[in-house]
Amino acid sequence: MSHSVKVYDTCIGCTQCVRACPCDVLEMVSWDGCKAGQIASAPRTEDCIGCKRCETACPTDFLSVRVYLGGETTRSMGLAY
């Protein structure tokens, strides 16, 4: 099953999602758009198992990382990888 992992520009660079992912789908990359100077990126979405631990770990009010399973669709906001 194909999963889509999207990282939005509300990411605060805390690394919680990266540490929560059991499949190393996420990594931090440099980005000047937030105080932390980094943002989560999802370069290995093919390894995503859809557990949504990254979503659970995200401390922002608007989840900065979202996993869309199979047929779920959304209009992308911010940065999508």
Swiss-Prot record:
Q: Which Pfam families match?
A: Fer4_7 (PF12838)
Name its cellular compartments: Plastid, Chloroplast thylakoid membrane
So what does this thing catalyse?
reduced [plastocyanin] + hnu + oxidized [2Fe-2S]-[ferredoxin] = oxidized [plastocyanin] + reduced [2Fe-2S]-[ferredoxin]
Membrane topology (UniProt): Peripheral membrane protein
Keyword Chloroplast tagged: yes
Where would I find the 4Fe-4S ferredoxin-type domain in this sequence?
Answer: 2-31, 39-68
The record's section on InterPro entries has: 4Fe4S_Fe-S-bd (IPR017896), 4Fe4S_Fe_S_CS (IPR017900), PSI_iron-sulfur_center (IPR050157), PSI_PsaC (IPR017491)
This entry's Enzyme Commission designation comes to 1.97.1.12
Keywords of this entry: 4Fe-4S, Chloroplast, Electron transport, Iron, Iron-sulfur, Membrane, Metal-binding, Oxidoreductase, Photosynthesis, Photosystem I, Plastid, Repeat, Thylakoid, Transport
Instruction: Provide the binding site for [4Fe-4S] cluster 2.
Output: C21, C48, C51, C54
Which GO cellular component terms are attached? chloroplast thylakoid membrane; photosystem I
Could you tell me what the cofactor note in this record states? Binds 2 [4Fe-4S] clusters. Cluster 2 is most probably the spectroscopically characterized electron acceptor FA and cluster 1 is most probably FB.
List required co-factors.
[4Fe-4S] cluster
Gene Ontology biological process terms from the UniProt entry = photosynthetic electron transport in photosystem I
Q: Where does [4Fe-4S] cluster 1 bind?
A: C11, C14, C17, C58
Q: Identify the HAMAP family for this entry.
A: PSI_PsaC
Q: What does this protein do?
A: Apoprotein for the two 4Fe-4S centers FA and FB of photosystem I (PSI); essential for photochemical activity. FB is the terminal electron acceptor of PSI, donating electrons to ferredoxin. The C-terminus interacts with PsaA/B/D and helps assemble the protein into the PSI complex. Required for binding of PsaD and PsaE to PSI. PSI is a plastocyanin/cytochrome c6-ferredoxin oxidoreductase, converting photonic excitation into a charge separation, which transfers an electron from the donor P700 chlorophyll pair to the spectroscopically characterized acceptors A0, A1, FX, FA and FB in turn.
- UniProt xrefs under PANTHER family: PHOTOSYSTEM I IRON-SULFUR CENTER, PHOTOSYSTEM I IRON-SULFUR CENTER-RELATED
Tell me how this protein assembles: The eukaryotic PSI reaction center is composed of at least 11 subunits.
Q: What is the protein name stated in its UniProt record? A: Photosystem I iron-sulfur center
- The record lists the organism as Rhodomonas salina (Cryptomonas salina)
Q: What is the lineage of its organism?
A: Eukaryota, Cryptophyceae, Pyrenomonadales, Pyrenomonadaceae, Rhodomonas
